[in-house]
């Protein structure tokens, strides 16, 4: 048995873009009865009935009119999302994930009539996201391939008109790459970038649990109003409720706004198939954080689970850099179970952040890039995040475990209330 003390934490949880929001203020307690080995957590203990009619298939007409559930020391109340600033402490820092969803689904029709879908996961050559979208003539991606057996290795072709130019996109299978496939794309013309290709030919991926085809409206509604950096294949949906008006209210309320970039991968939809969480392989995601965010020492409010994973990963990144100041930036990575290693050094959160700032000063960089595989489950000791805005998540998901860890296991009362009070769930649902 281990005793883990979680600091006084206010949690604001806002589910997704068009439904009900939830603000959680949770005073996390001493977890004296927590299992030493968090890997033994049974995912079946985090199940709940979610009828299909509770899943929001489309957003509300106005983003900020979704419901907001507020949880404060076991007390639950409701509001509308556009009033969120009134529930936040002045002088806090709210962290947003500014990633932008790309049109990652490409469809090719073989001469035989077979339809092949190529779902872009992660850039391979070039590996840098910004360079990838600017590249011309050729690039390679790690992908999921639908109907792979029907491909049989032939070159796939598809023509499209871009900027008045007839462009033929060619796709060639290279090799299997762990759980994905390496695909090389090529096309003629120095004036057509891969970003142009996706804009003209790609389809926006929406969550599979919506059980519908992507519509033209999703190109707008499945992006946050502050999205900037292309790279995600799924939206950071806690941010979908924010409007320019809400952001202005936050500014007027004295809330500092900072942005990080975490490109959300398809792994966010990966179900937990093992009985115990220790058997689940958490997906890895790439992160970019600016120096200004690290220098802001205000109380931290995370918008969404991607922001939580980013911010909490910073603590463990600081531990690494405190121990070894010469690590190459390309090798900076947080392993899945790293936070639960009781033998690692202990630093105060600000000391860990200072180690990152010192590293950045020595390297003369204004942003730091790294990847994280961190999994946050009950028993996790939150280091930096004090409030959380998030969605209502799927049963038996790693995201639900993250929320449970944040509210000291009281997730059932929150979700029972939401289910019985007409809250809308998942990506286009409400917020908490």
Predicted regions and their residues:
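Ser/Thr/Pro/Gly-rich low-complexity, intrinsically disordered segments
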Residues: 11-13
């Amino acid at each position: 048995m281990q005793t883990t003390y979680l600091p006084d934490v206010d949690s604001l949880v806002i589910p997704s873009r068009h439904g009900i929001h939830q603000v959680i203020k949770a005073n996390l307690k001493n977890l004296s009865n927590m299992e030493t080995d968090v890997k033994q957590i049974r995912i079946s203990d985090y199940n709940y009935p979610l009828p299909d009619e509770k899943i929001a298939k489309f957003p509300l007409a106005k983003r900020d009119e979704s419901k907001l559930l507020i949880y404060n020391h076991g007390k639950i109340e409701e509001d509308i999302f556009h009033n969120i600033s009134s529930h936040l402490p002045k002088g806090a820092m709210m962290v947003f994930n500014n990633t932008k969803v790309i049109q990652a689904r490409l469809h090719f029709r073989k001469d035989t009539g077979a339809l092949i879908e190529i779902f872009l996961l992660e850039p391979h050559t070039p590996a840098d996201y910004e360079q990838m979208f600017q590249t011309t003539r050729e690039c390679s991606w790690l992908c999921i391939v639908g109907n792979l057996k029907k491909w049989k290795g032939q070159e796939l072709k598809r023509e499209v008109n871009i900027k008045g130019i007839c462009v033929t996109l060619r796709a060639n299978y290279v090799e299997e790459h762990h759980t994905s496939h390496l695909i090389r794309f090529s096309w003629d013309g120095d004036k057509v970038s891969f970003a142009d290709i996706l804009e003209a030919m790609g389809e926006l991926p929406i969550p599979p649990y919506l059980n519908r085809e992507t519509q033209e409206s999703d190109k707008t509604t499945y992006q946050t109003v502050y999205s900037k950096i292309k790279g995600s294949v799924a939206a950071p949906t806690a941010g979908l409720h924010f409007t320019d008006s809400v952001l202005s209210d936050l500014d007027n309320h004295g809330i500092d706004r900072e942005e990080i970039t975490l490109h959300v991968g398809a792994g966010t939809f990966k179900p937990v198939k093992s009985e115990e969480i220790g058997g689940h392989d958490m997906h890895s995601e790439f992160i970019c954080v600016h120096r200004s965010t690290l220098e802001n020492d205000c109380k931290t409010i995370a918008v969404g689970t991607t922001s939580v994973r980013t911010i909490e990963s910073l603590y463990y990144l600081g531990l690494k850099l405190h121990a070894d100041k010469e690590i190459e930036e390309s090798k900076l990575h947080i392993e899945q179970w790293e936070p639960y290693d009781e033998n690692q050094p202990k630093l105060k959160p600000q000391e860990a952040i200072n180690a990152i700032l010192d590293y950045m000063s020595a390297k003369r960089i204004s942003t730091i890039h790294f990847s994280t595989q961190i999994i946050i489950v009950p028993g996790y000791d939150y280091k930096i995040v004090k409030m959380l805005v998030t969605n209502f998540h799927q049963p038996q998901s790693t995201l639900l475990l993250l929320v449970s860890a944040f509210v000291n296991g009281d997730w059932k009362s929150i979700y029972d209330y939401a289910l019985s009070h007409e809250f809308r769930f998942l990506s286009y649902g409400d917020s908490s």
